Amino acid sequence: MRVRFAPSPTGHLHVGGARTAIFNWLFARHHKGTFIVRVEDTDQARSTRQSEDMVLDDLRWLRTLWDEGPDIGGPHAPYRQSERTEIYHRFAAELMKRDVVYRCYCTEEELEQKRKAAEAAGRPPHYDLKCWYNRRNDGAPHAVRFHVPGDGDVTINDLIRGQVTWKKESLGDFIVVRSDGLPTYNFSVVIDDHEMEISHVIRAEEHLTNTHRQVLIYRAMGWQVPEFAHVSLILGPDRSKLSKRHGATSVSQYAEEGFLPEAMFNYLTLLGWSSPDGKELFTREDAVGKFALERVNAAPAVFDHQKLAWLNGQYIHAMSAAELRPLVARFFDAPWIEEGIDVVKTSVHRLTQFADALRFVREFTCAEVDRDFREKLRDELRTGGIPTDEASYKAMVERLKTATGLKGKALFMPLRLAITGSDHGPELVRVIPLLKRASEIDPAVLSPLQRVEQCIR
């Protein structure tokens, strides 16, 4: 089994492209096959080597590493379409010998007039075959057109959508090499997939409308047609095509917003595919073992940012503070960060949220608390000491109950306000020891006692 992911490098990797790459990667790994990255960079105005690097970096971040590609080479190099022009010309010449393509000398102005005339007459805007019937080879600038033979149907058995059929009469002769010498997408993709021995073409639904033309080229060359699987669109919450107005759409944006690659991989795998055991949280190895195109849904998938955030939180909560520290340090760091992570991680769903969740450690503002309560708390912390664990915390609480005559919320709310300056946050049994230890190694942190004393003055 040989599959490929063929991005056009015009910017960072879109989540739709990322999902297609993941499905190809999973299919290859499940079948112990080969996953290839091929760069379709023939759009000279938009494709850049910098954009290619961005796409490859995004794939590396997702850890969907490839076996052959533009950076590592392989037996079917080169893996950039811009470096394969001679190959395309060779096969165009072969098709010319077989009399299935022909030179088209019509200018853009002529073609536009033909289109308008066809539309005015209520006919499909197909090419009128002028250059098919009037062959010449005088060296003038020309495109190369594929001649669609006769009537009949073109049918494929799509592995996701089932049988799909097109009428040949709906096609019209189409260009395979432009007048500037560059191949069209439909021509180059067939040549590349054949030359690279691609067995399964797993790609976005938007390419389905190109498939009948590609099948005709395969047949004209006498080549075996690969299996096709067209993956559905990804929609926004309003069920329109996912776009920037719905929020982040590129993999790199989610990385910058504090999402983990494993969570992103897990979530994108679920967009259109379901595990046979119904699980939504799984390892990469689990997904490889269970992945099958038969379980990919043909219906569009809706991108749910809240579900992605929940899933990301599950991965964060399962990690140790030591594992999270280097990841969190990209966004926020402190000498006490590891202990801080442990205190707040169950309330966090993105790495970027740790900074806000731990802001109370370095930032403190006196909240409105009864002076008598604050003085009793100060005395308790001076004489009983600042709690360092659950046992000493519980002992402090019991003594405060006796000293103040308060219990329940009437005790814990002013205690929280006096220590943190906020009416919500992590459990005090963990916050107070954290503040004590952080104040001993970070001059920007006030200890619990210093906070209470500061607000009595």
Model-predicted regions and their roles:
Residues 1-119, 209-223, 263:
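N-terminal Rossmann-like or analogous alpha/beta NTP/dinucleotide-binding catalytic cores
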Residues 1-5, 251, 285-293, 326-330, ...:
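Short amphipathic alpha-helical segments and their helix-coil junctions
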Residues 4-9, 37-41, 196-201, 249, ...:
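Glycine- and acidic
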Residues 39-43, 205-206, 235, 308:
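Acidic, glycine-rich active-site loops and adjacent beta-strand->loop/helix elements
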Residues 47, 84-87, 256, 300, ...:
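Secondary-structure capping and boundary motifs in well-ordered enzyme cores
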Residues 94, 102-230, 235-242, 250, ...:
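Active-site cores that bind ATP or allylic diphosphates and position pyrophosphate for catalysis
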Residues 221-227, 231-366, 420-457:
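Catalytic adenosine-cofactor/nucleotide-binding cores of aminoacyl-tRNA synthetases and other
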Residues 368-425:
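C-terminal accessory/binding modules appended to enzymatic or scaffolding proteins
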